[in-house]
């Protein structure tokens, strides 16, 4: 399974330099949503990485997709939230609460 990256220029450039091939630069949330939907239908993609800010804008539209989508901070830093979505995923998958 491959990892795909969907994000802004700074994010995608970093992942390209790291050697990832399935890297897609998008200009806005609509482009990101369309790209992620296309990637969701590809059998060779197992994980999609995007930015927290894009994820926030398209969350309702991507919540029922098949692929595992990970949101990471962009160049502006992490979004402050009441709950950490990674902790929630770990708790659901493993049954252990991270502190």
Swiss-Prot record:
**Keyword Membrane among UniProt keywords:** yes
Asked whether the UniProt record includes Coiled coil among its keywords, one would answer no
Where does the record place it?
Cell membrane
Alphabetically sorted, this entry's keywords are: ATP synthesis, Cell membrane, Hydrogen ion transport, Ion transport, Membrane, Transport
InterPro entries named in the record: ATPase_V1-cplx_f_g_su, ATPase_V1-cplx_fsu_bac/arc, ATPase_V1_fsu_sf
GO cellular component term, pick one: plasma membrane
The molecular function GO annotations come to:
ATP binding; proton-transporting ATP synthase activity, rotational mechanism; proton-transporting ATPase activity, rotational mechanism
Q: How does it sit in the membrane?
A: Peripheral membrane protein
The Gene Ontology biological process annotation of the record reads: proton motive force-driven plasma membrane ATP synthesis
- Please give the Pfam families that the UniProt record associates with this protein: ATP-synt_F (PF01990)
Q: Where are the transmembrane segments?
A: none
Q: Which HAMAP family match?
A: ATP_synth_F_arch
Q: Name the job this protein performs.
A: Component of the A-type ATP synthase that produces ATP from ADP in the presence of a proton gradient across the membrane.
Family recorded in the similarity comment = Belongs to the V-ATPase F subunit family.
Under the subunit heading, UniProt states:
Has multiple subunits with at least A(3), B(3), C, D, E, F, H, I and proteolipid K(x).
Q: Which NCBIfam families match?
A: PRK03957.1
Instruction: Please identify the protein, giving its name as recorded.
Output: A-type ATP synthase subunit F
Naturally occurring in which organism (per UniProt): Methanococcus aeolicus (strain ATCC BAA-1280 / DSM 17508 / OCM 812 / Nankai-3)
């Amino acid at each position: 399974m491959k990892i795909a990256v969907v994000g802004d220029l700074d994010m995608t450039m970093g992942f390209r330099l790291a050697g990832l091939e399935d890297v897609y630069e998008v200009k806005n949330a609509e482009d990101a949503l369309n790209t992620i939907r296309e990637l969701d239908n590809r059998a060779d993609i197992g994980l999609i990485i995007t930015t927290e800010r894009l994820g926030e804008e398209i969350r309702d539209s991507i919540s029922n997709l098949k692929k595992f989508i990970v949101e990471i901070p962009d160049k502006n830093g992490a979004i402050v939230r009441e709950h950490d979505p990674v902790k929630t995923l770990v708790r659901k998958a493993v049954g252990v609460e991270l502190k």
